[in-house]
Regions:
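Glycine- (often His-adjacent) and acidic-residue-rich active-site loop
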Residues: 56-78
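Conserved CoA-thioester-binding segment of acyl-CoA-metabolizing enzymes
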Residues: 1-57, 74
Length: 78
């Protein structure tokens, strides 16, 4: 699976989801939410996955919440 805002890997029963937007402290936007849902659904249906690890890229923040720029441009109505 290829994602724009996430890095998603599965190895030895561990699914790793990394929010990969460190330039905005991993703030989520509509794309991020849709991709997160897809990755979690994939991990859920994979019988080999026993654990899901979610983290943010970079060393400054896990996730600061919603992306203010997207909210200003019309919000999360997509």
């Amino acid at each position: 699976m290829d994602f724009e805002d996430l890095i998603y890997t599965k190895t030895e029963g561990i699914a790793k989801i990394i929010i990969n937007r460190p330039h905005v402290y991993n703030a989520f936007r509509t794309v991020t939410i849709k991709e997160m849902c897809s990755a979690l659904e994939d991990a859920e249906i994979d019988p080999d996955v026993r654990v899901v690890v979610i983290r943010g890229a970079g060393d400054k923040a896990f996730c600061t919440g919603g992306d203010a720029e997207e909210a200003k441009a019309g919000g999360y109505n997509q």
